[in-house]
A protein has these predicted regions:
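Short, basic alpha-helical nucleic acid-contact segments in DNA-binding proteins
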Residues: 83-105
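Single, function-defining residue in the core of a domain
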Residues: 1-59, 67, 76-77, 81, ...
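Short alpha-helical "recognition helix" segments of helix-turn-helix
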Residues: 64-71
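A short structural micro-motif
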Residues: 72, 88-92, 322
Length: 406
């Protein structure tokens, strides 16, 4: 999606066709078109979105954005007025994203042991010159078709929790160790779904074994050999209720375990404990999935799918420029991020419906002589294409597994 695409009328109308049908009504509902004076330049939701998506999608300064649209024959707006519009636009853009994310919810997802697998994670973004996190983008991603089911933008204080999302019966929520606490798991179970998370003994109440006594996760895992799997039924408390689950563990291959210990040493420095270093050599999971529905080995394989959401965040930051926050204001940052999310969902839709955007050439409609000339031209030597550079894009050598420690 180029800068020209967002300015040119033909491309712009194509983009609008992918938006929810009620995008204009939502703009009125969220008071985006209210004005104090009669000479307002932006009077339609279409004009408002054109300014916002050009500003965020092309990473243009405010002044350059309004200048480009004015030169293309659009409304003449001051940079300060666009800034004020951005400050108020976050709720409207959020409503658009919420209506666009479940667009493939009716599709029959590929199921694994009867589950629809959903990945939950968040990525951080920083502003210019920042020394810490300025905002977080929280996402629920369905594995079967890599569709964004839900997304939410918060400031730096918005924690990672399953409670930000609603889950459906038949879903399996997969998250890393920061989601491993009793409240998060209880929320998923209350929705009628199941959870599969990386075990974090520091954030959980003591796990009780079926025969009595508390589980010592490291001691129980210590006797495992490579490729061995431990599967123990456990219970734990959340308020007045007791939840049932399974503790699953396996030992990492020696090379992967050493890499995991290097990461732990780098993160904790001299304060790293021997127990933490030893536990880095294992993958430990906690799940509410019944044993008769999914074996421990299958749960370990399912957790390895979590790396897909990390790749999605990298794609967003690469293609949509998520890592380039425009300024320091919380309100405009949230609006800017929702605009980026909206563009990401639009790209997702367009990639699925690409045949409608670029219909294939019907060879039967081309005269035979023209077909011969076309073949001769394609056989002639020509300048290398843009993609034909000296350094080919490297393969993803991490492979689909990316190790169990991912």
């Amino acid at each position: 999606m180029t800068t020209l695409s967002l300015v040119r009328d033909g491309d712009w109308q194509t983009l609008l066709s992918y938006l929810p049908s009620e995008y204009a009504r939502l703009a009125v509902e969220h008071k985006q078109l209210q004005t104090q004076y009669g000479n307002a330049k932006i009077t339609t939701a279409e004009s408002l979105l054109r300014f916002i998506l050009l500003h965020a999608g092309a990473n243009l300064p405010l002044l350059q954005t309004v200048t480009l649209i004015a030169e293309a024959g659009g409304p003449r707006l001051s940079a300060m007025r666009l800034h004020m519009k951005m400050r108020r636009a976050a709720p409207y853009l959020q409503a658009l994203v919420e209506r666009m994310t479940p667009w493939r919810a009716e599709a029959r997802a590929e199921q694994w042991a009867g589950y629809s697998m959903v990945l939950i994670d968040a990525t951080t973004v920083c502003g210019p010159g920042a020394t810490g996190t300025d905002a977080r983008v929280h996402t629920k991603l369905r594995v079967a078709d890599m569709a964004i089911v839900e997304a939410e933008v918060t400031d730096a204080h918005g924690g990672e929790t399953f409670k930000r999302f609603l889950f459906q019966p038949g879903e399996l929520a997969i998250g890393d160790r920061c989601y491993c606490n009793a409240g998060n798991i209880a929320h998923v179970v209350e929705c009628g779904a199941d959870a599969l998370v990386r075990f974090n003994g520091y954030s959980l109440p003591p796990l009780q074994l079926a025969h009595g006594g508390s589980l010592d996760a490291l001691a129980a895992s210590r006797g495992l050999r490579e490729e061995g799997v431990l599967d123990l039924p456990v219970t734990f408390e959340h308020g007045d209720e007791r939840l049932r689950g399974r503790f699953i563990a396996t030992r990492l291959p020696r090379a992967d375990a050493e890499e995991a210990r290097k990461r732990v040493r780098k993160e904790h420095g001299a304060q790293v404990s021997p127990a933490l270093l030893e536990s880095a050599g294992f993958v430990m999971l906690l799940t509410t999935v019944p044993r008769e529905r999914m074996t421990a080995s299958k749960c370990l394989l399912a957790y390895r799918l979590r790396w897909q959401i990390e790749l999605q965040f990298k794609r967003w930051k690469s293609l949509c420029g998520f890592h380039r926050l425009p300024n320091y204001r919380d309100d405009t940052i949230v609006a800017w991020l929702y605009a980026k999310l909206l563009l990401g969902v639009l790209l997702d839709r367009m990639s699925v419906d690409r045949s409608e955007l670029s219909p294939p050439v019907q060879l039967e409609a081309i005269p035979p002589q023209a077909r011969k000339r076309r073949r001769r031209r394609s056989a002639a030597p020509s300048e290398p294409a843009v993609e034909g550079h000296e350094h080919p894009v490297p393969d993803d050598r991490g492979g689909p597994a990316a190790t169990l420690s991912a």
